[in-house]
């Protein structure tokens, strides 16, 4: 039996992708399955009071809607729900950020 490939209407898309460091937050957008990242932009972390504000600025600047899912690496250990950056003042709850973004799923990983 042949299956058709998923479409951009896949419920897990679009996705917000990121790499967050103490100096910069790099964001990108994945519109659908198999699509490469687009709307790649680097924002200075110091210009934003929180990760949520930085993400909102990215989405607004790029003219993007709400992502369905999000994932980003961050320059600190992720051992539970509360994330505290060691080289920047941002601190957040993964659960609260997921709710704020309105995403179905949020994955935050230590980027080593």
Report residues per predicted region:
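Short glycine-rich, Thr/Ser-proximal phosphate-binding strand/loop in the N-terminal lobe
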Residues: 2-60
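Short beta-strand-loop/turn "lid" adjacent to the catalytic site in phosphate-handling enzymes
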Residues: 62-108, 112
């Amino acid at each position: 039996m042949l299956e058709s490939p998923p479409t951009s209407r896949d419920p897990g898309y679009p996705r917000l992708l990121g790499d967050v460091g103490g100096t910069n937050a790099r964001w990108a957008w994945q519109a659908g399955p198999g699509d490469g990242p687009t709307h790649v932009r680097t924002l200075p972390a110091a210009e934003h009071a929180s990760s949520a504000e930085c993400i909102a600025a990215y989405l607004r600047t790029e003219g993007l809607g709400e992502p369905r899912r999000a994932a980003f690496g961050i320059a600190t250990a992720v051992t539970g729900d509360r994330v505290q950056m060691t080289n920047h003042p941002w601190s957040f709850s993964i659960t609260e950020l997921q709710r704020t973004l309105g995403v179905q799923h949020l994955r935050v990983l230590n980027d080593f």
